[in-house]
Amino acid sequence: HDIYSIEDLAQLIYDLKQINPKARVGVKLVASSGIGTIAAGVAKAKADIILISGHSGGTGATPQTSVKYVGIPWEMGLTEANQVLTLNNLRHQVTLRTDGGIKTGRDVVIAAMMGAEEVGVATTAFVAMGCIMVRQCHSNTCPVGVCTQDEKLREKFTGTPDKVVNLFTFIAEEVRQILSELGFRSLNEVIGRTDLLRQVSKGSPNLDDLDLNPLFVQADPGKNKRYCEHPKINEVPDTLDQKIWPDIEKLIDQNKTIETEFEIKNTDRAVGTRISYHLYKKFGNNKLDENYLSLNFKGSAGQSFGAFAIKGLKLNLKGDANDYVGTVSYTHLTLPTTSPV
């Protein structure tokens, strides 16, 4: 991977929002100490969803060292992230999601009270379909046929959609019962309401010595909501593509092979990415000629020049380029051999 800092992540989010401006971008963070600071950085990078993943979940293909020693409970990571986002006036801009051991309706309600609008249920759903958790998902030897391509083993699979539907029906019913007992009409009413939680004595000095009060701290959202009431796509600044696309579209409508030239600066990031989005929206999966649209640029290109670009778009640069040139790109990119990349 090439994500080593919040800045790298922000660039990836920017690129993804250029190739599909209608998609919500989510970032998964492993619950750990200090996750609040990271979550704030992710929110400032314009992510739409932040997933706080606890240490109890994970695929069977996960290394045993990761299963045993990586991460902390989702409750600790979620509350810290929720508190820091709220204190920095960022909480209402992003949707918080959590997973990693969510099994019951009670877990769902507690997650909501600790700040999550959404929860993920994966391992429990697999168990409902017949998974026995032998943790060899990557070996193609799943004995119950849940995770294998072996035809003989797949014959042993007994899972049906109804089993998963029943699981989530019972989870939803338990959520409804708990909310009814507490006097609330919807799950939204309890999001961020840590004041509804308290630590229960276990009757053992070793267990009661654990102080859970930091989990119950309720940060003041000020004038903002305690959660993201109306999930929306966080917008990022426009690129050079948006400025030049109207002219290109006019030429496309004339049904001609197009070749044009533009000046480019190092602040022009992800050039060619939004144009690829427009081309795909216009032509779909219809294959374009390799040199259908040829764009010539002169200057210093910013990061992600030609990222996620599609076949049929040709980008020629006279100058130099920054990081992430041609990331996951199917376009024809040309740069002079004397240019530093």
Predicted regions and their residues:
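Conserved small/polar residues in nucleotide/adenosyl-binding loops
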Residues: 331-337
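The right-handed parallel beta-helix/beta-solenoid scaffold, focusing on the short coil/turn
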Residues: 291-293, 311-313
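Phosphate/diphosphate-binding loops
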Residues: 73, 83, 91-96, 103-128, ...
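Short, T/G/N/S-enriched strand-turn elements that build extracellular solenoid repeat scaffolds
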Residues: 275, 283-286, 302-309, 323-328
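Terminal amphipathic helices with adjacent charged low-complexity linkers/tails
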Residues: 188-235
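A glycine-rich phosphate-binding loop feature that marks nucleotide/adenosyl-phosphate handling sites
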Residues: 29-37, 95-106, 128-129, 184-200, ...
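Alpha/beta enzyme core
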Residues: 1-97, 106-118, 320-324, 330
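Feature marks extracellular polysaccharide-active and adherence modules
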Residues: 278, 298, 308, 316-320
